[in-house]
């Protein structure tokens, strides 16, 4: 029993660390780093068959199709601009294809006959058969119309697997999310927030060949079609009343379909206004929150109309994350937008729960619904923020390029007493500053127009950046003195971009009321709120804040200790309860602890399992007999095969194995492709080439970044030597080890190891490479266009540096040329482990 949950927990934590989702190559101590991985979803090799073959012959009356303009446009923004004014009144062109299961590398090709020049959207009837969203590459007549078309996303659809589970105290846990087994219609759209409407493809009259290649995930493709863009008209108020007195109330947590696995029912036990509410136990009573913030994420509810007629829509919601701001949702009824106003429903800020009548309480929008089953979908949309986001991306890119130009002249540290003549040294410097000032002013004005509060932190950040740039322009002889403030403004704007298109929203209830219905008021009275607060206060005296999950009475539960934050622990507990506990019936008790394991075991109160143990802990505890030797468990070799070769070595002691890896870290090399290309530099394959690139960058006052961790406390030392610097990686690439084979000591004094050590130290002493740098910020602004960092930097750059999207790649670290002529790119690493204690009563299970 212990072994089963132990194996499951190891898998859960590895999933939690996102390694498998980020990199397919293994990484661990002396493991090979991943192959090149671009800043966006990478394209794979072209499938069998040449998609560039000419389109089939057509009748002479139809003629050959002329290519659409600007097919080489760099991105969709330029493509949209080049096709502005094209007709939207095309006719649906459904492909003739056989339904098929497609995996990575598979392609589908079909021809469509376009009667007249027009813009079309790509619509698929599909079903994802793997947990990963489907990523498709689109070619029109063998050419990708714009860069985003090489990575179109069609999300997997998720449903609740059964009802919410309850523990012995009545606390509800979220139901497991499983893939929907029904086909769904999806339109190719932008999920980054840079565009509100779906992608539109310009097709000239004639026959065109459409090729779809699977780049990511697996899917069942039932149907493909090119359809004219949806053009709902403005709302027209009906003249008559249907006199419908019915009303329908459905709960947010009862959603039947989601296109994001994280859109799960949630609990709010702090407010009496939510339905249902309870201060004593966990009740699932809403959906959304920060999980429902990404543009394009959608939730669907089913409802049934008994009487046909006009209905109004009310939302009981909470939007308490964007201070003074608004979020937007796109409403669809039965998959269609009822009218133009439904594309941008505005939800304002308030700390608590509030209600919104669609269209306003005085003149609510009335939507006609036939009797029978219907669906209601709310999709997160950036609304007018999409244009602001695009403008912000342009201005931050311009500021980043200008900062690199300034750094090339002044160096990283500015001499305030020196005149650098920036206005003369940098071509168009004054004009560039004017453009940045104008763009920032326009963005701030647009943001103020959208926000409900006149002054917010978002607008203040933009106004402050505008002020700094204006000071640089107005002081030509001392402009260099504002470099630090300019850098700070850039980083603040970049951080702002990371959340600019986030649209978090919580939905408690949705109410559809007939035009003559009287809906009862379900909001709590003053006395209800007071009673709820009193009950909530009293429960604090008996709450257990240490235990994240509990078990049924009479059942012996496995106790799991972790040292994470409560939010991370709750996520892990949800994974355990939804997967392991539900499948095996073995209860697991998750506890947050700060105590040391030895002290707990001496008192007889230790756990069965322990997660996130540092590199030194397993052997340290094994010496004292606190951990169980795992080498005797059946199936161990099969379990170890899931990890990188040698990942378990730090946990071996005296012939035994006392822990398994639960996280593994290794190094990647990150490059700013735009800067490297502008300077004529290529990706370095060896360390000699890397140093050569570093020298060329230093001539322009730019830098590289290398990983190094100063040992300031025992925690730093315990994290693992492989992740502190590149020295262990250099040893691995040279076929050397840091320790003797019998583990009797360190080999650093041996001649070969000392030579490698001297080479590593020489990077800092001979070539003056910086020891410690703020790589994330230096990389995003461009003053350190190449560097080596932990693989987690990939996630950080993807999530927090949207302004440089498509302008960087992550790839393997440089290598050492071996005697056989092969370049060894091995990377050392670090990680944490999980172990079973000797207090466990059922180790044989």
Regions found by a protein language model. Name each.
Residues 19-37:
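Sec-dependent signal peptide cleavage junction
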Residues 34-53, 57-511:
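Extracytoplasmic
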Residues 116, 307, 801-845:
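Extracytoplasmic/periplasmic substrate-recognition and gating elements
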Residues 538-554, 615-668, 691-693, 752-756, ...:
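Hinge/lid segment of periplasmic solute-binding proteins
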Residues 553-566, 580, 586-591, 609, ...:
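Short, well-ordered beta-strand elements
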Residues 653-658, 662, 667, 691-746, ...:
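Extracytoplasmic/periplasmic solute-binding protein
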Residues 742-772:
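Glycine-centered hinge/linker elements that transmit conformational signals in sensory
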